[in-house]
A protein has these predicted regions:
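Catalytic beta-strand/loop cores that center a nucleophilic Ser/Cys/Thr
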Residues: 148-224
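Bacterial Sec-dependent N-terminal signal peptides
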Residues: 1-29
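A glycine-rich, often tryptophan-bearing local segment used as a flexible ligand/cofactor-contacting loop or short
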Residues: 94-169
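Extracytoplasmic/secreted proteins, especially bacterial periplasmic and envelope-associated proteins
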Residues: 50, 54, 82, 99, ...
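Extracellular/periplasmic catalytic domains that process cell-envelope and extracellular macromolecules
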Residues: 28-30, 60, 78-82, 97, ...
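Helical hinge/lid and interdomain linker segments adjacent to catalytic or ligand-binding clefts
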Residues: 35-36, 40-124
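Proline-centered loop/turn at the N-terminus of a beta-strand
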Residues: 33, 114-116, 193, 226
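Extracellular ligand-binding/catalytic regions of CAZymes and related secreted enzymes
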Residues: 27-32, 38, 60-64, 201-216, ...
Length: 262
């Protein structure tokens, strides 16, 4: 009888501990909030969908929340104050309202959060009737978009700054599959901190569209906000790359002011 009582007591205590643990997890506050500005219904839809699916899993793993928008109308100083990370998921640097431009500039120049940009975020020039956003061009290194590899190509990326937190756990070289590599009217290198470049001789299939020295991952250290741009991000196939997913994960945590995990 005494043994049975002890058994019931221990079982009861175990259940209480389980309920307390579940309750704690249910009420656990997210560690940060991210805003994801997406380009939808275009040639990058597959990449965007794959990225959002990956973000759902990663946000649960790292306990953060994110909101998705596909236009800039709602962006203001007050709106951005709710987000510690701004992810520009292929949304181009045009079709922004004057209010959203001003709010974004303050967000970046005052260091109010961190920024991660992909691919189309460097489509700088006059497109769809919109003028080039000069501030964004300077932010990206004073560049103007020039050309791209229409057929897409797999290529080797070389890490230049292996000590950058976004490169934590990455090899010095790795392959990025099936992407659309951009060229610009000038090299951004003199005006930005280059983190990685692409080896144009490694393009498969080969292409004559080249820059020579070709940065593809960089940061603008003149901004108070932590920021990083990835030129890759055209096709969903990139999410077959463990290295790309590792960089994306590292970038989110770093932009949020946290240490990337191994």
């Amino acid at each position: 009888m005494k043994k049975r009582s002890i058994y019931y007591l221990l079982t009861g205590l175990l259940l209480v501990c389980c309920f307390l643990s579940i309750g704690k997890n249910l009420t656990k506050k997210p560690s940060f909030h991210a805003l994801v500005l997406t380009e939808r219904s275009g040639i990058h839809e597959g990449f965007v969908v794959a990225a959002l699916d990956w973000l759902k899993d990663f946000s649960v793993e790292q306990n953060f929340e994110f909101e998705v928008i596909n236009k800039t109308d709602s962006i203001s100083d007050a709106y951005l104050s709710h987000y510690q990370v701004f992810i520009q998921l292929n949304y181009p640097p045009y079709m922004w309202t004057d209010q959203s431009k001003a709010a974004f500039i303050q967000y970046m120049e005052d260091g109010r959060g961190g920024w991660i940009g992909f691919h189309h975020a460097s489509l700088l020039g006059e497109f769809d009737g919109y003028p080039m956003w000069d501030w964004f061009s300077q932010f990206m290194g004073g560049i103007r978009w020039k050309n791209y590899i229409a057929a897409r190509a797999t290529a080797t990326v070389h890490v230049e700054d292996k000590n950058h937190p976004v490169m934590k756990g990455l090899p010095e070289t790795f392959s990025i599959p099936d992407d659309e590599w951009y060229t610009y009217d000038k090299n951004p290198r003199p005006n930005v901190h280059v983190i990685a470049n692409v080896d144009e001789s490694s393009y498969q299939p080969p292409s004559d569209i080249k820059m020579g020295d070709h940065p593809v991952i960089w940061s603008n250290d003149k901004m108070k906000a932590r920021n990083i741009y990835f030129q890759m991000g055209h096709h969903a196939n990139i999410f077959h790359s463990a290295e790309f997913k590792k960089m994306f994960a590292n970038a989110i945590l770093w932009a949020a002011g946290k240490d990337p995990v191994n």
